[in-house]
């Protein structure tokens, strides 16, 4: 989860988020190199005392500043396209979870099991336990197994929403009348927090998402208790 004064990305809890972290560092390195190079050239032009009689025309430098940015863009675009296609790929999911956005709460359906659906509301501050997280905890958490491919289907009943869990690298738009899907895998047990990331009305800030990832044997017990 996000913590106070956290300027970086959240710790990754899925292979997809790990790749997004690597891409962030890769892009930041390229941007740093560009900034240093441009700053150095500007400094040299401003503070040297040389006179260039051919400053208005230079075919070589024009070729360089046309070709070099194209090469740099390729180094950014190719990893980005790979990640975009990776996010859209569905790999034989073990479990399908359906999430429906409402004003202003989420409802969930485990479509692989009969009669397993519930609503998830934010716990108000005056009802929150001492060790709870303000504006993040919910009354019914989404429980998912660790190290299993999860497919999530996302839609909405009223206005646009967005189902987002940053530490998993997941962000899916919830659009009324449309079913969007995404595939992810959680590689460690724990609690993962997210929020609606599409402005959807007065209480947009008060519809959090909480995922609890547990081992498969505990997940089966939870499913059994919920369906009985």
Curated annotation (Swiss-Prot):
Reactions accelerated catalytically: 4 Fe(II)-[cytochrome c] + O2 + 8 H(+)(in) = 4 Fe(III)-[cytochrome c] + 2 H2O + 4 H(+)(out)
Protein name: Cytochrome c oxidase subunit 2
Binding site for Cu cation A1: 161, 196, 200, 207
GO molecular function: copper ion binding; cytochrome-c oxidase activity
Top-level class of the enzyme under EC nomenclature: translocase
Job description of the protein: Component of the cytochrome c oxidase, the last enzyme in the mitochondrial electron transport chain which drives oxidative phosphorylation. The respiratory chain contains 3 multisubunit complexes succinate dehydrogenase (complex II, CII), ubiquinol-cytochrome c oxidoreductase (cytochrome b-c1 complex, complex III, CIII) and cytochrome c oxidase (complex IV, CIV), that cooperate to transfer electrons derived from NADH and succinate to molecular oxygen, creating an electrochemical gradient over the inner membrane that drives transmembrane transport and the ATP synthase.
Family: Belongs to the cytochrome c oxidase subunit 2 family.
Gene: COXII
Swiss-Prot/TrEMBL cofactor(s): Cu cation
Pfam families: COX2, COX2_TM
Disulfide bridge positions per record: none
Transmembrane intervals: 27-47, 61-81
Keywords: Copper, Electron transport, Magnesium, Membrane, Metal-binding, Mitochondrion, Mitochondrion inner membrane, Respiratory chain, Translocase, Transmembrane, Transmembrane helix, Transport
EC nos: 7.1.1.9
Keyword Transport on entry: yes
Protein's organism: Anopheles quadrimaculatus (Common malaria mosquito)
Subcellular location(s) of the protein: Mitochondrion inner membrane
PROSITE patterns assigned: COX2, COX2_CUA, COX2_TM
Mitochondrial intermembrane-side positions: 1-26, 82-228
């Amino acid at each position: 989860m996000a913590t106070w004064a956290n300027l970086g990305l959240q710790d990754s809890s899925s292979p997809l988020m790990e790749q997004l972290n690597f891409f962030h560092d890769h892009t930041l390195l390229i941007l740093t190199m560009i900034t240093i190079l441009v700053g150095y050239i500007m400094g040299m032009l401003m503070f040297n005392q040389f006179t260039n009689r051919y400053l208005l025309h230079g075919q070589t430098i024009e070729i360089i500043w046309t070709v070099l940015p194209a090469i740099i863009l390729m180094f950014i675009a190719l990893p980005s396209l790979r990640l975009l296609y990776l996010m859209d790929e569905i790999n034989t999911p073990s479990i399908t979870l359906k999430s429906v956005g409402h004003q202003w709460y989420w409802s969930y359906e485990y479509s692989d099991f009969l009669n397993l659906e519930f609503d998830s509301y934010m716990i108000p501050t005056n009802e929150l336990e001492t060790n709870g997280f303000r504006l993040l905890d919910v009354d019914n958490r989404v429980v998912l197994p660790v190290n299993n491919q999860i497919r999530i289907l996302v839609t909405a009943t009223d206005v646009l929403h967005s189902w987002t869990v940053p530490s998993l690298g997941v962000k899916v738009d919830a659009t009324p009348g449309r079913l969007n899907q995404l595939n992810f895998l959680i590689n460690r047990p724990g609690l993962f927090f997210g929020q609606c990331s599409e402005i959807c009305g007065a209480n947009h800030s008060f519809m959090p998402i909480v995922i609890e990832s547990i081992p498969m044997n505990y997940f089966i017990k939870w499913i059994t208790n919920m369906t009985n």
